[in-house]
Each structure stands twice: as structure tokens, then as C-alpha cells.
């Protein structure tokens, strides 16, 4: 399905019934990143998955993207589907978006799951985004496929998961150039560590133990500053922990949501 939200068409799916849960994917991915989570969560929840601005089959205008703009995308989509409040699961970029939207729209999220993400990037992380933007401007998205897979997944997992690597590689390769550039400019502007105390809903911070893109120290910072938080470190997982250790990721979600 698609809806015209905040000036762009947004592709989304709604599955199951019960309280709302919204799933927000990583940079250069798409809503299919959440297929396993949709399958599990839709037994007890109404699950909204969507392609973020600039990704998948959603609009990718060649304009500057901001976290405020993306928060408005989220609020507009939730209004469109009739979700007054939702649980939020965001991984990497999706976690950044969830943090910003929760501060811009207090009360919108009943809980937050923040996976492999951060409330503020280190200077070298900001520079890395600038370098990747320069690369795709010069050479296109194909130049991002192998470096991104290597950064996101451990070599041992890549070697035994060729079909998944092909799939994720296609997601990266087909991400609209303007969307990748736009979101890569917006993400590094996140700087909300000093405001995390304002997010008083229950949170679960998750991170792959071997994540080098958003390492565990960033998750520990989130967990330390959020008033009601629990930290789950997923062994033997890199950046896309829901794909590398699907069983452990979904078991943690099941424990977190058992009271909702």
C-alpha cells in the first residue's frame, strides 16, 4: 500500500491485529528487513512496516532531509493508518528516527526498542557518513554494496549466508541515490543524549556484541541515560542484529512485549 504523506508517497504494510507496533529499518534497507519480526509480532499486534523517505518504494526527492521532516513523515503515516499511539522498533537509522520523533511528538510511542543505534555520533562517525556520500556521488550505489556488507556483518556469517547477502546487497544497490544522500546527511545531526531523560516510556536498547557500525558503547550510553531502560547485548551479531541472530532478537522482543 502507499499513502501520500508530507509531500511524498510512502509504501507501507499493515499485518495482524491488536496494539500497534511500527518497524523502522536501517539505512539502505527497506521494510522487508523486518519480515521475520512481522511474522512473529503480528500474532499479537497490528504491525506497521514502511519504507522510510528515500528508500525502497517510497518517494526519494532530491531535497535536503532533516530529522524534523522525517519525524513528520512518521506522524503523518501513523495518522493515516489511524494509530494514535504505537510501540516503536527502530534499528540503526530507524532508532535515530524513533528518538527524534519521540521528543518531537511526546506520547506518540508507548514503548521504544532501539537496536544498534545512537543518540549522538562520534566525530569519526560523522566523517564516515560524509565520505560515503562522496563515494556514491562519484560512483553510485554499487560502490556501497561490498563495503556496507563488510561493515554490517561478520565475515563468518557472510560466508555461510550467500542468499541473504545477495538480498541485502540488492537493497543497498537499489536504494535511490538521492534518498541515501538525504538520509546520510540527516542521521549525523542526531544529538539528543542530553534530552534522553525526557523519554520516560519503557525502552529496550539492543545491540549486536560485534557491531562495529554502532558499537555497544553507544547502546550503553542510551541505556544509562534513558530513565526506564533495559540493555540486551546479542552475542555473535553485528550491525543488522535482527538478520544475523533472528532467534535471539525475536526472543528478546517477545520478553519485552509480554506485558502489552
Named regions from a protein language model:
Residues 36-39, 48-89, 251:
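Active-site loop/oxyanion-hole signature of alpha/beta-hydrolase fold enzymes
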Residues 8-60:
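Conserved HGGG/HGGXW glycine-rich cap/lid loop of the alpha/beta-hydrolase fold
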Residues 90, 94, 98:
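Gly/Ala-rich beta-loop-alpha elbow adjacent to hydrolase catalytic centers
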Residues 199, 205-207:
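Short beta-strand/loop motif that positions the catalytic acidic residue
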Residues 209-214:
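Acidic catalytic loop of the alpha/beta-hydrolase fold
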Residues 120-127, 139-197:
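Conserved alpha/beta-hydrolase catalytic His-Asp/Glu region
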Residues 99-104, 108-139:
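Flexible "cap/lid" loop of the alpha/beta hydrolase fold
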Residues 229-260:
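Catalytic active-site module of serine/aspartate enzymes centered on a nucleophile-bearing elbow/loop
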Amino acid at each position: 500500500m502507499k499513502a501520500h504523506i508530507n509531500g511524498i508517497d510512502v509504501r507501507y504494510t499493515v499485518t495482524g491485529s491488536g496494539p500497534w507496533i511500527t518497524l523502522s529499518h536501517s539505512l539502505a534497507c527497506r521494510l522487508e528487513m523486518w519480515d521475520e519480526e512481522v511474522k512473529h509480532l503480528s500474532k499479537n499486534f497490528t504491525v506497521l512496516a514502511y519504507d522510510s523517505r528515500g528508500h525502497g518504494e517510497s518517494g526519494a526527492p532530491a531535497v535536503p532531509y532533516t530529522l524534523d521532516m522525517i519525524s513528520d513523515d512518521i506522524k503523518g503515516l501513523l495518522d493515516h493508518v489511524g494509530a494514535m499511539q504505537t510501540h516503536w522498533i527502530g534499528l540503526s537509522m530507524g532508532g535515530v528516527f524513533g528518538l527524534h520523533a519521540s521528543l518531537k511528538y511526546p506520547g506518540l510511542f508507548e514503548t521504544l526498542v532501539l537496536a544498534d543505534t545512537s543518540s549522538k555520533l562520534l566525530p569519526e562517525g560523522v566523517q564516515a557518513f560524509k565520505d560515503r556520500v562522496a563515494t556514491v556521488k562519484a560512483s553510485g550505489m554499487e560502490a556501497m554494496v561490498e563495503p556496507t556488507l563488510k561493515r554490517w556483518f561478520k565475515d563468518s556469517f557472510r560466508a555461510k549466508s550467500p542468499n541473504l547477502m545477495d538480498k541485502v546487497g540488492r537493497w543497498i544497490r537499489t536504494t535511490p541515490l538521492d534518498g541515501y544522500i538525504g538520509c546520510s546527511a540527516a542521521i549525523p545531526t542526531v544529538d539528543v543524549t542530553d534530552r534522553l531523560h525526557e523519554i520516560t516510556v519503557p525502552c529496550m536498547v539492543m545491540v549486536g556484541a560485534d557491531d562495529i557500525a554502532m558499537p555497544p558503547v553507544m547502546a550503553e550510553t542510551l541505556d544509562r541515560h534513558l530513565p526506564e531502560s533495559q540493555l540486551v547485548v546479542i552475542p555473535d551479531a553485528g550491525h543488522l542484529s535482527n538478520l544475523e541472530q533472528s532467534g535471539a532478537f525475536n526472543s528478546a522482543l517477545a520478553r519485552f512485549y509480554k506485558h502489552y
